[in-house]
Amino acid sequence: MFSLIGAKRQAIGIAALAWSTGAVMASEHWPDLPVGIKNGAAARIGNMAYVGLGSAGTDFYALDLNNPSKGWVKRANFIGPATNGAAMAAAGGKIFAFSGNGKATPDAKSPIIFDTAYVYDPGSDGWSKLDTQTPVGLSGAKAVGLADGRIAIFGGYNKELFDKYLADVGAIDKDKEPEAYRKLVDSYMGMKPEAYRWNDEVLVYDPAGNNWGSLGANPFLPNCDPAMATMGEGDFLLVSGGIKPGLRTPEAKLVKIRDGAAHWQKVSDLPPLSSSEPQEGVAGAYAGKAGDDVLVAGGANFKGAQANAAAGKWFAHDGLAKSWRDDVYAFDGKDWKVAGKLPRGLAYGAAFDAPGGLLVVGGEDRDGKARKEVFLLKWDGKALSVEN
């Protein structure tokens, strides 16, 4: 999950800027990224946060969360092709990056979903390509390290369908052949969620044996770009995400990994924004623990897509404007509530649990711009504030 943030420059020199939504900006504290990053990947080892790839190309950066005044330090460049939406997690003191999508070579006609895996060693500051292939496409998936040293992976786009669609789209000149182009797009985007064949297994990768396994099937529609928070050892909350291109779900699920299997439990959906505005769900939101609660912030959706899908119009986002959300929700383990607002609508950045709240790193704004700002969403169970 990668996502983004607000306007730090406006906060310089301001001790506290109150927002009508209940958010407050405090004194500057967290350093900006060297470059804007959206659709990248992130992981954490101890007090070190790592972010890169996506719009940053092969760049990779680290921040000491215990000493943020040192700023982001550039680490060794990723050695694979530049990739968006890779699944990344830490295990055994190293960072593993799986799949993602991009061009295999600079002169490739269309992007593909990669089936490759790489490992980063902070000790040697170096990347290596692993001698393995992902069993399925894992672009848009979420990865998380387990206590036994393995890595669990949820969701992911179907490589065969994704690659073929982008190759077919790339082969048509939409200006010269508008009808053929529209027919192709309508055909792909008009399928029901099940037809996209997104990964519905909870895959598990074992770095020690360099092998793959499964923790069982997801009983729900699989998601890409959901928000994810660790609730405890082996317990993970998956929130919202896409169920097909352009259509999100408001559902949230608790996954408990026990005795070699993943056990799923549906919890409360994200709440409607008002009596007149139903919850569309979001993709690319930020998430993490803040005290006893889980915060989910931002993300992107298409207002009206749920209504279209309910009416059987499966190209649900056709003609709809994409919306970058600024809503922040808090989950107490039973119910959700609206906690406040981000400084601006953001999605597809990184988030890290931090003392007192959730650290929001980079992401994409409503103009599609990759952002550099970093800030802390502080939550005391009642009020939300923003610390830069």
Swiss-Prot record:
It is found in: Periplasm. It catalyses: N-acetyl-alpha-neuraminate = N-acetyl-beta-neuraminate. This is N-acetylneuraminate epimerase. Its EC number is 5.1.3.24. The lineage of its organism: Bacteria, Pseudomonadati, Pseudomonadota, Alphaproteobacteria, Hyphomicrobiales. The keyword Isomerase applies. The gene is nanM. It comes from Brucella suis (strain ATCC 23445 / NCTC 10510). Kelch repeats lie at residues 48-92, 94-147, 149-186, 187-232, 236-285, 307-356, 358-387. PANTHER family: KELCH-LIKE PROTEIN 32, LD33804P. Pfam families: NANM. GO terms for molecular function: racemase and epimerase activity, acting on carbohydrates and derivatives. Homodimer. GO terms for cellular component: periplasmic space.
